[in-house]
C-alpha cells in the first residue's frame, strides 16, 4: 500500500484532488537550510532546533523557554503545503469558481492543534481547514467498504503531486536533519548523498554525533 493506493481511495471518498506532502517537507528543508546558514554559520546561534513537529515545538515553548530562540521559524510540512495550495487557489483562474477546503492527512493528533494556531493562518484564514489522522482515514475507508485490491492506483494530482527523496525521509528518525544536510551540501552527487545517509544521522540512538562531507 502506498500513496497511489490512497489517492484512489480518497477519490472514491469524494476528495477532488490529492497532493504529496513531501513537497511541503522539501520546502521546509530548503527554509531550514537557509535559517541554519543565516543564524548558525554566522555565529548568531550555537545550534538550530527543527520546528517541523508541533508537539515538539509545544514541548520546547512550555518546558524549555530558554531554547525558543533556537527553534527554526519554518512551518511544518503540513503548514508549508497548506499555505502554498491555498495561495495557488486564490488565483481565480486556478480556483475556477470553487472554494478550496484543505484537508490534511497526518499520523499525529498534534497536527490538529497546529492547524488552529494563529501562525497557521494567512490573510486571516486557516491554511489547513481540517486535519484527519491516518487512523481516521483508514476507518473512513473501511466504513465506505473500499478495498485497496479493487482500486486502480493513481498518481497524485499536479502541480503539487510530487516530492524529492529528502521530503520523503522527513518521516524517519534523523530524516529532517539529513534532508537539511542534503540542501546545505553543494555537491548533490549520488556518492555524496550516500555518504550523508551513512554518516550516522539516521538511527534511534538518544544522542548522535557525526560528521558529513562538504564538497
Regions of interest found by a model, annotated:
Residues 1-215:
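Iron-sulfur-associated redox domains of electron-transfer enzymes in respiratory
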Amino acid at each position: 500500500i502506498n500513496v497511489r493506493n490512497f489517492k484512489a481511495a480518497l477519490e472514491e471518498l469524494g476528495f477532488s484532488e490529492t497532493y504529496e506532502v513531501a513537497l511541503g517537507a522539501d520546502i521546509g528543508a530548503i527554509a531550514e537550510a537557509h535559517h541554519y546558514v543565516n543564524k548558525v554559520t554566522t555565529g548568531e546561534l550555537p545550534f538550530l532546533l527543527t520546528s517541523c513537529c508541533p508537539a515538539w515545538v509545544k514541548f520546547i515553548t512550555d518546558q524549555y523557554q530558554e531554547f525558543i530562540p533556537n527553534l527554526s521559524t519554518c512551518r511544518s510540512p503540513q503548514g508549508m503545503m497548506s499555505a502554498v495550495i491555498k495561495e495557488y487557489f486564490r488565483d481565480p483562474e486556478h480556483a475556477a469558481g470553487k472554494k478550496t477546503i484543505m484537508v490534511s492527512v497526518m499520523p499525529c493528533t498534534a497536527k490538529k492543534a497546529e492547524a488552529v494556531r494563529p501562525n497557521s493562518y494567512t490573510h486571516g484564514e486557516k491554511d489547513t481547514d481540517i486535519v484527519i489522522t491516518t487512523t481516521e482515514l483508514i476507518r473512513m475507508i473501511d466504513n465506505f467498504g473500499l478495498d485497496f485490491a479493487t482500486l486502480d492506483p493513481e498518481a497524485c494530482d499536479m502541480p503539487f503531486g510530487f516530492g524529492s527523496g529528502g521530503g520523503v525521509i522527513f518521516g524517519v528518525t534523523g530524516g529532517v536533519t539529513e534532508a537539511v544536510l542534503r540542501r546545505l551540501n553543494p555537491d548533490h552527487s549520488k556518492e555524496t548523498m550516500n555518504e550523508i545517509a551513512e554518516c550516522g544521522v539516521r538511527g534511534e540512538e538518544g544522542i548522535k554525533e557525526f560528521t558529513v562531507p562538504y564538497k
